[in-house]
Amino acid sequence: MTIRTPNELRVAVYDRFWSVAGGGETYAGSIAEILSLDHRVDLIAHEPIDVGTLQERLGLDLSRVRVVVVDDCEPIERVSRAYDLLINATYRDLSPNGARRGISIVHFPHLPTEHLAPWQLRLMGLLHRVARRSIGPVEFDSGFHPADIIRWQQVRWSNGRGVLRVAITPTTTRNLRIAVARFFPDRTDRLVRVKVDGVDVTSFTVVAARNRLQMLRPQIVTVPVTGARGGSIVELLSETFMPDEISGNGDRRRLGIPVVWAGTGAGPISRLLETVSLLGAPRRGFPWLDSYDRIVANSGYGAMWVQRLWNRRCEVLVPAVSQRTGGEKRPIILSVGRFFAPERGHSKKQLEMVGAFARLSAQFPDWELHLVGGCTEQDQPYLDAVRRAAAGLPVVFHIGATGEELDALYSTASIYWHATGLDEDLDADPERAEHFGITTVEAMSAGAVPIVMRAGGQLEIVREGIDGYFFADAEGLLARTRQVIDDDALRGRLGESSVERAKVFDRDSFARRLRIMVDEVLR
């Protein structure tokens, strides 16, 4: 295999969610920024990106990178074949690598079959073996996104014009049976037109699921298809929606209908398979990972769970963290993180922090709690609940704060709180812990004393009693905070140590580790 000299290498950095411009995108963008000094780097995106705007939001220099926009439904494996190295930094992406070399960035590992019991996994394996012989020769030709997992079904969302190619003996007519999942986030029914070889033949309505049973049982549609040379073309035409417009989750794909499977099989076995949604569940294993040369997590915590869940070796590349400037400290406790309810992910626990601060405020009335973070329309009820809990307390909200405002808060804050993972069963759901803790490092770099949850990536940042403290519950949070507030000398010593500790995670350290890793992969 021929690899070009370093200044000729082509590198692709793929992130489906560039427009979100969150922590994951900052991580991916930092990789692109550094590698662009030595290589030709493209950002692979699914919609146009204004590089100037993106680099401003991420706080990076992306002037040397190029943006390559590809269709949502174009397989990344195919797109990446033109590159020497693919770095796939998309959250929960199952795309195989097509480049000469590949690095998979795992923000946190997941199991495609994590919701299945052992008996369901065994049944699933049996069904897949039977299905290969029973559902007939049908392929997803174009207009379908890579596989997604909905509950325990694997589906292929169309983009509004999904094309199936059906291999049937010419002039022979058979019934094509299509299983369509009924999950639509807005619970709106969908009208679908069907064309066969360019001719309108029928239409049907996918009735959105109203309960759990309907969610698990796909809707079966039958379409008569007459064989043609090279295969018959079946088009599924529907209106589309964008998930981000409904749930604010950053998913800006245009989605039509979710197809579980399609086949031309007949007889009792095929009928049985149609009633079992497990047929659409993903197979066990992680075949897409085999196409990558390295698996990389942003913390030792993530790497540990890659080993436990995937049984794969994983390297650690901690994020590059912007170093802030400290100033004159005020009686401020700061916490930075997006506002969203626990049921929507690893919540930053602002509601619990306000509850703890209410008890603290009576003893230390001069101290303030400042909460910084964004909030989508969908998460507004949670923010409203936090505001109600904070009524009458010296709690200041900074929703959508500017970079300058955040810098000023870091500069003056004396203590930094981070409570992600509080009151969670992290053995059962480890993703609810903080995977690393970029904001903790940012606050430390400005001299704030971190008092953070004893879980996840925080354990790799803070040194107990040297830079700050850990807590396991609300009582521990209050006890450590009182200790730091009461002792000015202790607070000063911990703050000075925090500044030095934060330098371990600066950009130069990140760049050095990244270059070593890439050189090893390309060697």
What positions do the PLM features span?
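Conserved catalytic-core segment of nucleotide-activated headgroup transferases in glycan assembly
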Residues: 262, 308-309, 321-324, 329-391
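Active-site donor-binding segments of glycosyltransferases and PAPS-dependent sulfotransferases
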Residues: 38-95, 175, 186, 191, ...
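Nucleotide-activated donor-binding/catalytic signature segment of Leloir-type glycosyltransferases, i.e.
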Residues: 59-62, 373, 383-407
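Membrane-proximal helix-turn-helix segments that form the acceptor-binding/catalytic region
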Residues: 121-134, 268-295
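Acidic donor-binding loop of glycosyltransferase active sites
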Residues: 411-435, 448
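Short hydrophobic beta-strand element within catalytic cores of glycosyltransferases
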Residues: 440-452
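Conserved acidic donor-binding segment of nucleotide-sugar-dependent glycosyltransferases
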Residues: 464-475, 483-489
